[in-house]
C-alpha cells in the first residue's frame, strides 16, 4: 500500500481569480476530481487512525472569509473534511501581512462565528501563527514564544 497522502493546499476561494485565490468552481472541480479517482478526504487528526484506502487532505491557509462563504457550504454538503489554519490575531480583521506585496488585495479574515461554523461542521482548525510574522527572521526561542501565543 502507498502510504503517501496528497494534500491540496489553498489560500483563498473566490468568485474572482487573483494572486492567491482560486475560483470557487475550480476548487469544486479539484475536490470532485479527487473523489472520482476514489479518494476520500480526511482531517489531520485522522492520521492517528489506521488509514485504509485512498485518502487526501484539504487545507486552507490564513482563514479568508471567502473560504467560509464558498468552501464551507460545499464541504459540509458533500461531507468532506478539511483543515483551516488561522492567523489568530487577525480573526474578523484583514490580511495586513500581505500589504507590502505588489499585488496586494485587502481581504477579510473569518469572524469568530464563521470559525465556530467551520468547527460545528466537523472541520478542523489549526494555528497559522499569531500574526503571520516571517518566522525565518526569528530565533528558536522567539519562534516558540510566538507559537504558544497563537494557540
Label every PLM stretch briefly:
Residues 30, 71, 111-114:
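Residues within well-ordered alpha-helices
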Residues 22-52:
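C-terminal domain-boundary segment and adjacent tail
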Residues 26-29, 70, 149:
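Alpha-helical elements of Rossmann-like donor-binding domains used by nucleotide-donor carbohydrate transfer enzymes
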Residues 15-19:
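Short, solvent-exposed loop/turn elements at domain surfaces
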Residues 29-38, 74-79, 121:
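A short, Lys/Arg-enriched amphipathic alpha-helix followed by its capping loop at the start of a domain
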Residues 1-12, 24-30:
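N-terminal anchoring/stem segment of glycosyltransferases
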Residues 5-14, 53-56, 76-151:
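Metal-dependent polysaccharide deacetylase catalytic core of the NodB/CE4 family, i.e.
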Amino acid at each position: 500500500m502507498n502510504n503517501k497522502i496528497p494534500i491540496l493546499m489553498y489560500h483563498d476561494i473566490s468568485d474572482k481569480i487573483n494572486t492567491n485565490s482560486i475560483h470557487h468552481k475550480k476548487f469544486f472541480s479539484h475536490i470532485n476530481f479527487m473523489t472520482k479517482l476514489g479518494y476520500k478526504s480526511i482531517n489531520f487528526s485522522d492520521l492517528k487512525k489506521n488509514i485504509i484506502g485512498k485518502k487526501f487532505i484539504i487545507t486552507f491557509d490564513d482563514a479568508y472569509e471567502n473560504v467560509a462563504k464558498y468552501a464551507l457550504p460545499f464541504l459540509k454538503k458533500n461531507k468532506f473534511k478539511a483543515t483551516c489554519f488561522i492567523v489568530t490575531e487577525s480573526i474578523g480583521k484583514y490580511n495586513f501581512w500581505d500589504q507590502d506585496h505588489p499585488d496586494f488585495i485587502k481581504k477579510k479574515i473569518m469572524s469568530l462565528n464563521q470559525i465556530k461554523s467551520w468547527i460545528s461542521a466537523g472541520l478542523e482548525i489549526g494555528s497559522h501563527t499569531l500574526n503571520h510574522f516571517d518566522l525565518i527572521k526569528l530565533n528558536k526561542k522567539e519562534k516558540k514564544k510566538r507559537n504558544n501565543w497563537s494557540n
